[in-house]
Amino acid sequence: IKVVEMMDDMRNHVKDWGDRDEVKNYLEQLDDKQAFDRKGLIYGMGHAVYSLSDPRARVFKSFVERLAVAKGREKDFALYSMVENLAPEVIAEKRHIYKGVSANVDFYSGFVYSMLDIPLELYTPIFAIARIVGWSAHRMEELVNMDKIIRPAYRSIMPEKAYVPLEER
């Protein structure tokens, strides 16, 4: 919801959505706690594990673009893309963080929900529905592994097994 609200605020305060400097200036104001909710955050940017890029977001973006074209929302998509490209630059300059910050998968999800005419009140429940299986699986792993946190970057040491289709099991 915060990404959607931030982008709505940006649309209301940035006159020319195609002006890179004007969009960057707004992002700098966000970072300086001078715009939107004054928290100093650019919502939808960064991830605890995926610092260089969120592979889910890269895949999702191509589908978002196709939906935006189908729904006649290319200008909105262009603004989201510009923010995705400029935000890491602003964060690096303002916070002196150079390890890499990228859009996470949630950066575009609210935009998709709006294109599908899903009410804002359902965004958070949909967010939870999409993650509950993963959260549950991680909790079960933690219980089995004595509260050791499982990270996606871990490599399995198990021998590789061939996939067996359900019909053959």
Kindly label every feature range from the protein language model:
Residues I1-R169:
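Non-transmembrane, aqueous-exposed alpha-helical and coiled segments at domain scale
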